[in-house]
Amino acid sequence: MEASSSLNATEVAHPLVAASLGLLRDKNTPKAAFAAALAGVGALLFWEASRALRLATTQVTTPGGAVADVSARPDTIVLLPILRAGLGFLRGIEPWVPGAPVATVGISRDHTTLEPRIYHETLPPLAGRDVFVLEPMLATGGSACAVLERVRAAQPASLTLLSVLAAPVGLATVHQTAPETRVFVAAIDEGLDARGYIVPGLGDAGDRLLGT
Ligand code: URA
């Protein structure tokens, strides 16, 4: 695992992440396999990013009648997939935190200016919560920053961004906008093409996830 502490970003180096990334990059990977790989990478990034979570402690009674002190997941986690591609991560992450509220923000990009436009937003209370923003493709950083600005205004306890791929400019923009955000990525790519797509990238993650 490599960490770029200057940008608060961690590149998660794991054989399963690398193999899934190979599938995601391959233009011949069919929809179902793409969705499975995206969910798998989301789960592995969440695994790494949640290491620092503060566990709650409680007591349970075992089938043998003994009382045991046990750890319990905190009820502070909020998952925030950015539509559409973030839904691909949600599938992999939600089984680990089934009761966590799911906030949703829908953002489209103007294809000429590449500026983000929010067309949908449902945010539960975020103050004091550990918010995980799911944005598989961190390209210009415009969409992520539009969300991060809204979330940080609600004063969460922590802010984490999970992405399969990040362009260096996207990482820098996120760090400039919300430097407290911890970023976990499968890989940092070379840059962006003229349409704002990540290079070498994996294409349009939302289209490939949903078969559109
Ligand atoms: N969104 C995508 O789906 N792919 C990119 O390369 C950039 C943004």
Report each predicted region and the residues it spans.
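PRPP-associated nucleotide enzymes
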Residues: 1-212
